[in-house]
Amino acid sequence: MLLAWVQAFLVSNMLLAEAYGSGGCFWDNGHLYREDQTSPAPGLRCLNWLDAQSGLASAPVSGAGNHSYCRNPDEDPRGPWCYVSGEAGVPEKRPCEDLRCPETTSQALPAFTTEIQEASEGPGADEVQVFAPANALPARSEAAAVQPVIGISQRVRMNSKEKKDLGTLGYVLGITMMVIIIAIGAGIILGYSYKRGKDLKEQHDQKVCEREMQRITLPLSAFTNPTCEIVDEKTVVVHTSQTPVDPQEGTTPLMGQAGTPGA
């Protein structure tokens, strides 16, 4: 029973570790997406969220942070997206393709390390020319000067929560595993207790039955003992018979039958 508990505990820890270990991915609408995707499609590159939103009036209120990765701040049902440079140089929304997180995140992370390094080096000269100049939009430039200061703290907090939060599905799976483990342990304990009690009861009943049988068979043993068998007595009658004796001389009577002497 202890071995079963240890195995169940190790399995639950492995599942939880696998869920926590998906640091290179994030949850969105029940799906797991790569966290370091910087290209929505081949040949395109995502723009920095703060720089792109500063030049758009219809940008989502809750930004995705100070980075150039695919995110879904407005909860688009199509999935994560990012801003790319349009034909007129104005940032436009573009859904990200091939963003599903693989089964093993440890194998997928090395493939994108080069892209992360390129994005961390800073925007090149071509990317700087894509954004609209500040003097072209005087009314928006003032808002752009104030909005990043307020939005950075909020977006950094959201980004930190994305890395630590497992999502609703992760919590549901964890709670379900704990409930299953507890139910299995309780079932093992109840089954063992029931079987042990049943065995003890059978042993007690068997002893009681043996005692009753001894009480019943003890008086009969005296009658079945061969030393105590009753033997029928036979009466032997002895008859005494008188044998005839021959008369000897000197024994004849002097008187005859008639009673006369000398006759």
UniProtKB/Swiss-Prot annotation:
Modification note: N- and O-glycosylated. O-glycosylated with core 1 or possibly core 8 glycans. N-glycan heterogeneity at Asn-66: dHex1Hex5HexNAc4 (major) and dHex1Hex6HexNAc5 (minor).
Membrane topology, from the record: Single-pass type I membrane protein
Compartments reported by the entry: Cell membrane
Matches recorded under CDD domains: KR
SUPFAM superfamilies: Kringle-like
BP-aspect Gene Ontology terms: negative regulation of phosphatidylinositol 3-kinase/protein kinase B signal transduction
PROSITE patterns (UniProt xref): KRINGLE_1, KRINGLE_2
Cytoplasmic side: 190-263
Single GO MF annotation: phosphatidylinositol 3-kinase inhibitor activity
S-S bridge residues: C25-C101, C46-C82, C70-C96
Signal peptide: 1-21
Start and end residues of each Kringle domain: 24-101
Residue ranges, annotated region (Disordered): 242-263
Protein function: Negative regulator of hepatic phosphatidylinositol 3-kinase (PI3K) activity.
Listed name of the protein: Phosphoinositide-3-kinase-interacting protein 1
Record lineage: Eukaryota, Metazoa, Chordata, Craniata, Vertebrata
